[in-house]
Amino acid sequence: MPSSEDYRQFLEVFYPFFLITSLISQLFVIYFILNYTPKQLQTLRYILVNTCVFQVIHVSACYLMQFRQVSNLVPMEVWSYGYGRHFEAFVGYSLYHVVQTSTVASGISVVMTLFLKYEAARNVKLTSWKRYLIITCILLPLVTSVTLEIILIITQSLPNEIRERYKLINVDVKDHSVVGTLNFKVLASQVNVCIMSSSVVMLPIIGLSSRRKLLEHIQKTSDRVSQTKNSQNKMFVKGVILQTFLPLCFYCPISSIYFYCIVTHEEILFQQYFMFLIPAFPALFDPYITLYFITPYRNRVKIWLRMNKVSPKSVTLINVNCNY
């Protein structure tokens, strides 16, 4: 079995590689979103950029702090091996919650994209109050989680006696610092863990349900729109559904090991070092799903790769008229 030192040596190389490749991917797709999104889809453009921003925050915080969740200790401790280990403990503890929030926020942005696409596909303008109600329900888990995390930061890391205790613990920081502990006897922690876990599981369920309804609607209206438009709509839906499954695929396996460690207090180094890194992997794959499954972006990539030979006039038409 790899030792703690083996994991550290690997992650010293992997963290910079992951940061650079993820940021390049995110900046690349943001360029496409800002420059090649049709004008009639500006709201979706903001949602897509929002998703990218949260994923950039997630990856950057992971690299800066390089957390290790020492699950076999009671109470459970969170250590930092990154440059952030030199910060005061409450800063690291706050960034720990930022990482968790970013995971939920980027997933909720995908759900918002699905809702806007569903609304556009039905071609029915919802009343303002009904639209606000749906958006509020979508955002409620995120707002609740952020509120609970603010409470935890204020109560678990900001009191002077706690700050002084961690200053003494980290007075001679070398390879890592202790940024905080996780106390699951605190109600706010319990509720927040439930929100985080249930949100990741619910995203694919919502996605599959929306997929079924969207494809049914596309099928019903297939005789009123072109075959090309139908294909574009189906392709977009497939891409968004795939994006809803990414957090589940990367979050659930490592979280299952995490909950096992909470119950048994067993030391599993892989879980401790990768608990925050693996859920950040969608930030690397998400941009390429967006580029492939959204028609205007895919067409532009093909033009750059000389897979599509079109005149300048045709390029303009693609940017203006292509839909998701």
From Swiss-Prot:
Keywords: Membrane, Transmembrane, Transmembrane helix. GO terms for cellular component: membrane. The chain crosses the membrane at residues 13-33, 47-67, 95-115, 134-154, 186-206, 239-259, 274-294. Its main location: membrane. It is found in: Membrane. The keyword Membrane applies. It is a multi-pass membrane protein. It holds the Pfam family 7TM_GPCR_Srd. Belongs to the nematode receptor-like protein srd family. This is Serpentine receptor class delta-41. It comes from Caenorhabditis elegans.
